[in-house]
């Protein structure tokens, strides 16, 4: 009989304990699975697209994801997430109406600071409704979440995490790296958000960058965060904490940017780049679109889309675009809603919805005309397509500033651009091979990373869950004051030390000068009187030559030409010399 292998003997020995091992393994699996709540912003559906993609990936890892959404907000049902509804100020229809009203304000030039405050007020009012909803808060606490994901566009997420007493991480769906993250941000080469600057600045640009930075910090500190602090005070949220503390309390910052797009800058261990969540290979086009694209032949086609959030363009801009596009030899497919432009070319196809990623991945595409939305730019970069960008609001300007600086596209200002400038920009990115070469190079850099952005996101979420918030990644910057951070205490010590040294040196100098003057005065007057005692002037004299208690002598030889007295006071005078 052949010998029984050792591992078989081990299995036979463990057979009676198999149920216990199975139970232990199941317990380990359950412990690794987590319950995560996401607080998306009350508008901007593009942000929700990203969170749905992340939720699906988390579901594959065994995690549960819950979206906190207002009643009436439309979202496709899925087994990958579930919904916790609440009565908010917006549903899908009213949210879209509000956003489109702001778009009309932009095109009419009425988007002033008051309009921006109105948007901020809507966010804070919705937060007030959430925090004040006791039934909702009770239901959320009973869920016993392991982690909360905060979109910084919805600052209420910090307040909700504090109320629930749960760990939280920031998942920024926009191109946003605020100073509140805590990472060093030298203004000499780190452009502030909305500054429209690159990492190479001249003197005037650095001045502008500094001014924008100070305005941003003022706005966050005195306009944004206090609104949410008042909400916490109103509803007696305990323990009391400032919004700054809550922002700094994030376990991790996952930012939707990428080394291929962002300018190099200092960062921290708890800040990771996960830009490009929605990027993926192109799928086959629907038959009608495939036939239309194939009909473009060697000229190719141009894709035009301003994103899901921009449904209507002003008539002036739409006509400029239509006229410029009509002059191109390429075919044009344009995602468009509203009234048809009056000068639309025969080469242009209007469509209300299109498979943007699949069109960008088609081999016959020549260029992309976009608003510079971050999701669109990452899809464009992924497929290596040159772009002409017309930013409209938000982070569109910063995104397109980077695209242009990287040599992948051209930025145009919708307020000042002409139809000719738009046409020339499109012709340039289509015919100048450097734009496509640079776009393809950035595509290689973007893809040459450890895993897809979705997988990296899931990895980091698992990481902070495994390590109970990963406090070891947090720098000490979160526990020191601004006074210490900017070394103002050191500057004060040096200033006081320099002042003390100045006064000590000044006092010593004054004393030395005073003593020197006194000694010099004594020497000078002794010489004038011509009196020495044992070769040393005794200092007892008068200007008329009288010496107290001594006989007055005439010393004619003391007077030389010019009348200057010369007294050799190195020895005593003899009577013969005085005679």
Predicted features along the sequence, with ranges:
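Donor nucleotide-sugar binding/catalytic pocket of nucleotide-sugar-dependent glycosyltransferases
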Residues: 252-256, 269-279
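Structured loop/turn residues at beta-strand edges in well-structured enzyme cores
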Residues: 143, 245-248, 266-269, 346, ...
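Long, low-complexity segments enriched in small/aliphatic residues
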Residues: 246-261
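Intrinsic disorder/low-complexity segments
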Residues: 559-562
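Glycosyltransferase specificity loop/lid
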Residues: 6, 12-234, 261, 275-283, ...
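C-terminal membrane-proximal segments flanking the terminal transmembrane helix
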Residues: 552, 569-570
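Short acidic low-complexity segments
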Residues: 154, 237-246
């Amino acid at each position: 009989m052949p010998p029984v292998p050792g591992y078989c003997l081990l299995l036979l020995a463990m057979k009676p304990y198999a149920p216990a091992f199975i139970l232990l393994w199941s317990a380990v699996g359950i412990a690794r699975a987590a319950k995560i709540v996401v607080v998306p912003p009350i508008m901007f559906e593009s942000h929700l697209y990203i969170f749905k993609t992340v939720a699906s990936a988390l579901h594959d890892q065994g995690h549960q994801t819950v979206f906190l959404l207002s009643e009436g907000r439309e979202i496709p049902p899925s087994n990958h997430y579930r919904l916790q509804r609440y009565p908010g100020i917006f549903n899908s229809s009213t949210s879209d109406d509000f956003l489109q009203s702001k778009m009309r304000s932009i095109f009419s030039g009425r988007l002033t600071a008051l309009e921006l405050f109105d948007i901020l007020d809507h966010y804070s009012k919705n937060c007030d409704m959430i925090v004040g909803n006791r039934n909702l808060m009770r239901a959320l606490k009973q869920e016993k979440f392991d982690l909360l994901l905060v979109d910084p566009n919805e600052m209420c997420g910090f307040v909700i995490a504090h109320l629930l007493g749960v760990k939280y991480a920031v998942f920024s769906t926009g191109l946003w790296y605020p100073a509140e993250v805590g990472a060093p941000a030298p203004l000499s080469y780190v452009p502030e958000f909305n500054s429209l600057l690159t990492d190479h600045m001249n003197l005037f640009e650095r001045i502008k960058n500094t001014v924008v930075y100070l305005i941003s910090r003022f706005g966050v500190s005195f306009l944004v965060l206090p609104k949410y602090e008042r909400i916490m005070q109103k509803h007696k949220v305990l323990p009391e904490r400032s919004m700054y503390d809550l922002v700094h309390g994030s376990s991790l910052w996952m930012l939707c940017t990428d080394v291929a797009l962002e300018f190099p800058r200092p960062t921290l261990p708890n800040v990771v780049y996960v830009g490009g969540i929605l990027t993926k290979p192109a799928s086959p086009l629907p038959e009608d679109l495939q036939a239309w694209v194939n009909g473009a032949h060697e000229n190719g086609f141009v894709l035009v889309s301003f994103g899901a959030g921009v449904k209507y363009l002003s008539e002036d801009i739409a006509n400029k675009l239509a006229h410029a596009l009509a002059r191109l030899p390429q075919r044009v497919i344009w995602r468009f809603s509203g009234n048809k432009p009056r000068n639309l070319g025969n080469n242009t196809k209007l469509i209300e919805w299109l498979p943007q990623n699949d069109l960008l991945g088609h081999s016959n595409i020549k260029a992309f005309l976009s608003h510079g939305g971050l999701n669109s730019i990452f899809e464009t970069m992924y497929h290596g397509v040159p772009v002409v960008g017309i930013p409209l609001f938000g982070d569109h300007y910063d995104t397109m500033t980077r695209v242009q600086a990287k040599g992948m596209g051209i930025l145009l200002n919708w307020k000042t651009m002409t139809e000719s400038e738009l046409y020339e920009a499109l012709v340039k990115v289509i015919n100048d091979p450097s734009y496509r070469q640079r776009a393809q190079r950035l595509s290689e850099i973007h893809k040459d990373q450890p895993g897809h952005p979705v997988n990296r996101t899931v990895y980091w979420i698992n990481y902070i869950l495994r390590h109970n918030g990963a406090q070891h990644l947090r720098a000490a910057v979160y526990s020191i004051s601004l006074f210490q951070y900017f070394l103002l205490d050191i500057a004060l010590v040096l200033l006081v030390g320099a002042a003390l040294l100045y006064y000590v040196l000044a006092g010593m100098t004054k004393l030395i000068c005073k003593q020197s003057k006194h000694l010099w005065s004594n020497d000078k007057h002794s010489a004038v009187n011509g009196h020495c005692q044992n070769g040393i002037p005794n200092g007892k004299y008068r200007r008329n030559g009288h010496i107290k208690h001594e006989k007055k002598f005439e010393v004619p030889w003391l007077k030389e030409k010019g009348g200057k007295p010369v007294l050799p006071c190195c020895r005593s005078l003899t009577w013969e010399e005085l005679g």
